[in-house]
Amino acid sequence: MVSGSGICAKRVVVDGRHHMLGRLASNTAKELLNGQEVVVVRCEEICLSGGLVRQKMKYMRFLRKRMNTKPSHGPIHFRAPSKIFWRTVRGMIPHKTKRGAAALARLKVFEGIPPPYDKIKRMVIPDALKVLRLQSGHKYCLLGRLSSEVGWNHYDTIKELETKRKERSQVMYERKKQLNKLRTKAEKVAEERLGSQLDVLAPVKY
């Protein structure tokens, strides 16, 4: 990613699983403003500190905030985990300026890991990981679970799709492991067959 690491890939795919919501959002906002394209997947597994009941009460208070004369004017209350995360990032960006709007346009958010991002190497942000930032024994809840409690209807669907994706990934991993094993065996056989010829080739090999 741009800041700190000195690496600037065209697009960075971040796995949101077990990252703290606010810390992940602030790191993402900083990278977006620096010109980085960021894709965040598995938003339903982002963590919030505090138990589910407490977080649900806070969200229900937020749902009561509306414009009395015309509620459709706002504020808009998102239920999907990806949109909740997107709104959190938006609050950390000056999105009403051209620079902020351009930064927000560089962000993509998804529940689960849809193609083609299931074939791309995914990153984590250590500064935002639950295991490093939350004390052991501290209560937390998942954003997907909270969303399903306040009106998001696709929690089970995403769970089912993720199970299928993991099964496909496991099959591909086993196949790759088998191919690597066969390649190692073939190289060993070739070395035994060539024998002394390898000593002649050694000085000119890369």
Curated annotation (Swiss-Prot):
CDD domains: Ribosomal_L13. Belongs to the universal ribosomal protein uL13 family. This is Large ribosomal subunit protein uL13x. GO terms for cellular component: cytosol; cytosolic large ribosomal subunit. The lineage of its organism: Eukaryota, Viridiplantae, Streptophyta, Embryophyta, Tracheophyta. SUPFAM superfamilies: Ribosomal protein L13 (SSF52161). The gene is RPL13AC. The keyword Transferase does not apply. Keywords: Ribonucleoprotein, Ribosomal protein. GO terms for molecular function: structural constituent of ribosome. InterPro entries: Ribosomal_uL13, Ribosomal_uL13_CS, Ribosomal_uL13_euk/arc, Ribosomal_uL13_sf. One of its GO terms (biological process) is translation. Pfam families: Ribosomal_L13.
